Swiss-Prot record:
It comes from Clostridium novyi (strain NT). GO terms for biological process: diaminopimelate biosynthetic process; lysine biosynthetic process via diaminopimelate. This is 2,3,4,5-tetrahydropyridine-2,6-dicarboxylate N-acetyltransferase. It catalyses: (S)-2,3,4,5-tetrahydrodipicolinate + acetyl-CoA + H2O = L-2-acetamido-6-oxoheptanedioate + CoA. GO terms for molecular function: tetrahydrodipicolinate N-acetyltransferase activity. Catalyzes the transfer of an acetyl group from acetyl-CoA to tetrahydrodipicolinate. It is an enzyme of class 2 (transferase). The gene is dapH. The keyword Chaperone does not apply. The lineage of its organism: Bacteria, Bacillati, Bacillota, Clostridia, Eubacteriales. Gene3D superfamilies: Hexapeptide repeat proteins, Malonyl-CoA ACP transacylase, ACP-binding.
Length: 236
């Protein structure tokens, strides 16, 4: 079934209707040679095995075959999860360990996603854009090309409370560390948001804003451009 990810109610419906998943990884010390694993993925031999599968099926298997098992250890990292993580194998971008990216996210060529970044469903990240450490992109947030989203910055999502207008960060915008862009705000091209700012309304192109709430303090000039220029080598 297709869902319109531009509509918060459609995203909510997708989450509601999705099959919830509690995957387990289990290390087993025992003889499973004659055990029926059914839909469980089973790898190993010589009394050591690794199992992958859904929680209830794994737990049933362990109980039914307890006489063949000496001991086991279970690893679990989620419970009743509605949305899988994004499959990043074929994405032409740099994605560092520890980034959390949900499915149905678009990431452009040569983008950089740093450790600890959290990117929710429906987000769009443009070519050459960097999402720095521990930054958060809420549902449906849109970042244009060559944006820098600073460490710890937040671009609010528009899933709950629902809104039809997502946050939009246009091309060549720099957002400083720990800044917050509130729901539905658009930041115009080439603008700069100072670190720690709270942006509560749309920002025009080519300006610098600072404060809480953020206010325009100057237009972007050559000095600003020099201080906020991006490094292409980080995107290779």
């Amino acid at each position: 079934m297709n869902y319109d990810l531009t509509n918060p109610y459609e995203i909510a419906r997708y989450i509601k209707e999705s099959k919830k998943s509690t995957p387990l990884k289990v290390y087993v010390d025992g003889n499973l040679t004659n055990c029926n694993v059914n839909n469980i993925e089973c790898y190993g031999e010589n009394n050591f095995y690794v199992l992958f599968g859904e929680s209830q099926e794994i737990l049933n298997f362990l109980d039914e075959n307890k006489d063949s098992i000496n001991k086991y250890r279970i690893e679990q990292d989620r419970r009743n999860s509605a949305i899988p993580m994004l499959d990043t194998k074929n994405i032409d971008a740099r994605i560092e360990p520890g980034a959390i990216i949900r499915d149905m996210v678009s990431i452009g060529k040569n983008a950089v996603i740093m450790m600890g970044a959290v990117i929710n469903i429906g987000c769009e990240i443009g070519e050459g854009t960097m999402v720095d450490m521990n930054a958060v992109l809420g549902a449906r947030a849109k970042l244009g090309k060559n944006v820098h989203l600073g460490a710890g910055a937040v671009v609010a999502g528009v899933l709950e409370p629902p809104s039809k207008s997502p946050c939009v960060i246009e091309d060549n915008v720099l957002i400083g560390a720990n800044a917050v862009i509130l729901e539905g705000v658009r930041v115009g091209k080439n603008s700069v948001v100072a670190a720690g700012s709270v942006v509560v309304e749309d920002i025009p192109e080519n300006v610098v804003v600072a404060g809480s709430p953020a206010k325009i303090i100057k237009t972007v000039d050559d000095k600003t451009k020099d201080k906020t220029k991006l490094m292409d080598d980080l995107r290779k």
